[in-house]
């Protein structure tokens, strides 16, 4: 290797392969000579290449990484300098960055994207509570701890600032493809630009390219300056929760964009069920209630509680690192899933009986809705949902149930008292009960595969890696 291409020298470390490079820095994989050859990453910043802005970015990055400690934020272990370089010594992430991860797989399944989003949202919530905005969120700045069951690590805080939703800086920061429109169009922006960037990352992970992906800078500029609503592709099919979040994140007007509080509480982000030390405690509390209801013969209530408990048990299973405790927990989870499936059969038979009994009421309601085309149309969708349900097409049936219920609930609020309102209320109750049952049924199937060791994230990665 020519001397000019050799990595810099740093006492106590052996610098090896180059991991990446930017305008003023190069990152190397390195080994600490002591401490059992600990593996780290070292960002080597050439002093010669630093202008005033670069110095400010570097100082910002060091200041923030020194003070923030979070499982999903890259850890700064130390920083040193000599006459030629400033060295940032960080934890090493063997999985590379999210950009490469997406590129090698083209698109990611929604469930994998949700796991990644939870981790990113967790880091952003931590930063938001400290009034820190990243301002350069993009897949290249999100690292993966490893390829097998990776954890995301938010990195590269060179553009970060201490700011809130009221602040309005003037300087243009970040990467255009992931940059919120207000950063370009008005130059006045606040912390909400990070939410737009999350939307772009989410879009790219699900659809394989960013919404403003362009062949030239002029085309990119045109898309950024446009007032057109961001259209979501119809394929791959997304859950209603995922689609709703994307649409709320990718609002060009920051005042119409989802707020941080709403984002952290959103059903698709679901921070409540993110793997953590608390999830096992919550799961245990719920399963105790489920067993009590089960013993009392309250099957429907017991099924609901078992399902709620499993929503915490599965992330608790992923969080547990001790092999023996994990296996014991998995055994218990399998028992609870088996009991939930038994209860499903009991509840389903009575549930379906109610559904079929509701047919005559539904037909009568249709007759009474001849003068209300919108109500009649929603009832037709409900009938289609029941037909799909009878065919065993749970996913399609659930979509149709939710579609019809959205309309019927609006109709109910506007309906005058009388026989039609009574029938409509009864129909909604029946459809809602069946929709909730199907949701729980689909979740139980997912939990079963996860609890049996087919851990969603690592399984997907293994399948993807086998194609390379």
UniProtKB/Swiss-Prot annotation:
GO terms for cellular component: autophagosome; cytoplasm; cytosol; phagophore assembly site; phagophore assembly site membrane. The keyword Heme does not apply. CDD domains: STKc_ULK3. Residues 279-347, 374-442 form the MIT domain. The keyword Transmembrane helix does not apply. It is found in: Cytoplasm. Keywords: ATP-binding, Autophagy, Cytoplasm, Kinase, Nucleotide-binding, Repeat, Serine/threonine-protein kinase, Transferase. Its main location: cytoplasm. ATP binds at residues 19-27, 43. Signal peptide: none annotated. PROSITE patterns: PROTEIN_KINASE_ATP, PROTEIN_KINASE_DOM, PROTEIN_KINASE_ST. Residues 13-269 form the Protein kinase domain. It holds the Pfam family MIT. The active site is at residue 136. It comes from the Eukaryota. GO terms for biological process: autophagosome assembly; mitophagy; negative regulation of smoothened signaling pathway; piecemeal microautophagy of the nucleus; positive regulation of smoothened signaling pathway; protein autophosphorylation; regulation of autophagy; response to starvation. Belongs to the protein kinase superfamily. Ser/Thr protein kinase family. APG1/unc-51/ULK1 subfamily. Serine/threonine protein kinase that acts as a regulator of Sonic hedgehog (SHH) signaling and autophagy. This is Serine/threonine-protein kinase ULK3.
